[in-house]
Swiss-Prot record:
Role this protein plays: Thrombin-like snake venom serine protease. Clots fibrinogen (FGA and FGB) very slowly, releasing fibrinopeptide A and a small amount of fibrinopeptide B.
Class of the enzyme per the UniProt entry, highest EC level: hydrolase
Key word Membrane present: no
Residue ranges occupied by any Peptidase S1 domain in the UniProt entry: 1-75
One GO process term, biological-process aspect: proteolysis
SUPFAM superfamilies: Trypsin-like serine proteases
Active-site residues, Swiss-Prot/TrEMBL: 41, 60
Tissue expression remark: Expressed by the venom gland.
S-S bridge residues: 26-42
EC number: 3.4.21.-
Cited InterPro entries: Peptidase_S1_PA, Peptidase_S1_PA_chymotrypsin, Trypsin_dom, TRYPSIN_HIS, TRYPSIN_SER
Location, primary (coarse class): secreted
Protein name as annotated: Thrombin-like enzyme catroxobin-1
Length: 75
């Protein structure tokens, strides 16, 4: 933000902080009760440790499966 003003946290109740474990990762805006809008650089790059299979580039998105269960959506 360039030229912004400080504000009280209670003035903008739709802002969210996204944490990975206990580390702040990114911010976003709550656009309804289930969805957060965030910047493209805040997206998840899911894959296998060995490499070669991932959603990091050239993928059109789809379900994110963790431990055999649906856990989200990649884009």
């Amino acid at each position: 933000v360039v030229g912004g003003d400080e504000c009280n946290i209670n003035e903008h109740r739709s802002l969210v902080a996204i944490f990975v474990s206990t580390e702040f990762d990114c911010g976003g805006d709550l656009i309804n009760v289930e969805w957060v809008l965030t910047a493209a650089h805040c997206t998840l790059c899911a894959g296998i440790p060995e490499g070669g299979l991932d959603t990091c580039g050239g993928d059109s998105g789809g379900p994110l499966i963790c431990d055999g269960k649906p856990d989200g959506i990649t884009s």
